[in-house]
């Protein structure tokens, strides 16, 4: 027995469009600069209170805030702009675990292999860049599908910034402790200087080697030491060595240009003895100019890799 249809034209039920779930979390826009602004305010507050009260219990807070603020902000920027599909856990793991392994491995190797000499900076650059690259390989050996220059840029930068944060904390601690006791002024100067220079050092260099490493990764997930990887490692090690030796190069240039009858054996002290105003101005010019040139070279290298990566323009 059939039932009568209700009067009027039949209406078909068409389900409305539904939004598929996002494959990755979307953080609020501008999270990185908000983190940077709040962190700067907290660091300034901690520094002011510590300087006014001379309370040594605040020193760990001051050191950690100053050392991790800039690296964390730049890793957040990289995650928001180009790395959301890589996952928070992988980027965070590269930052913390990769950075720690890089610092520990580089420190152990440098202690046994490096001795004071003209080639010390080159050796330090080769060792530290190799340690960070090995840390990145360790972090990605269980992620065989992660490949390509974009992923290498983001994850390599995460390892590099983790390395820079821990290294800055070590330098800040060393600057704090002196024969006269706690040197708070040296601590603040060290953190400000390294905080400003952080974006142009380890993060850029490891981003370059990471991009080369993952661009040459095999489809089965195995890494291979191809010639582009070795060339990138040698290139960033050279930038690293130039960055570290800028102070000594500036001293040498000033001596060559202005010194007449100067006892150059006193350069072992790390400064120009009996320097004039002209020499001090030239030294500042060469030191800052050298750092700027090395930073610009690193930025240009990263930008060229980003332009050549086809997936870079398609990231959310």
Where are these regions (language model features)?
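Hydrophobic alpha-helical segments at protein termini of multi-pass membrane proteins
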Residues: 1-316
């Amino acid at each position: 027995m059939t039932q009568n249809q209700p009067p009027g034209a039949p209406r078909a039920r068409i389900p409305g469009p539904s939004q598929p779930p996002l494959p990755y979390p979307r953080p609020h826009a501008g999270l990185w600069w908000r983190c940077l602004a709040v962190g700067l305010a907290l660091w300034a507050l901690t520094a002011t209170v510590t300087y006014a009260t001379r309370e040594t219990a605040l020193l760990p807070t001051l050191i950690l805030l100053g050392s991790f603020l800039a690296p964390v902000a730049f890793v957040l920027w990289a995650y928001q702009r180009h790395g959301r599909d890589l996952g928070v856990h992988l980027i965070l793991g590269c930052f913390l675990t990769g950075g720690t392994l890089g610092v520990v491995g580089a420190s152990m190797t440098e202690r046994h292999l490096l001795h004071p000499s003209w080639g010390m900076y080159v050796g330090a650059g080769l060792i530290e860049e190799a340690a960070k690259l090995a840390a990145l390989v360790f972090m990605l050996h269980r992620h065989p599908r992660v490949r390509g220059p974009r992923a290498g840029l983001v994850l390599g930068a995460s390892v590099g910034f983790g390395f820079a944060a821990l290294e800055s904390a070590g330098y800040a601690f060393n600057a704090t402790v002196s024969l006269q006791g706690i040197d708070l002024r040296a601590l603040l100067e060290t953190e400000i200087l390294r905080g400003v220079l952080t974006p142009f050092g380890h993060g850029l260099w490891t981003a370059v080697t990471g991009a080369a490493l993952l661009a040459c990764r095999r489809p089965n997930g195995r890494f291979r030491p191809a010639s582009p990887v070795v060339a990138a490692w040698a290139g960033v090690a050279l930038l690293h060595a130039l960055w570290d030796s800028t102070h000594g190069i500036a001293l040498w240039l000033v001596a060559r240009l202005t010194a007449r009858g100067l006892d150059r054996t006193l350069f072992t002290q790390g400064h120009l003895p009996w320097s004039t105003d002209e020499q001090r101005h030239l030294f500042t010019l060469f030191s800052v100019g050298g750092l700027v040139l090395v930073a610009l070279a690193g930025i240009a290298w990263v930008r060229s890799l980003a332009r050549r990566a086809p997936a870079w323009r398609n990231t959310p």
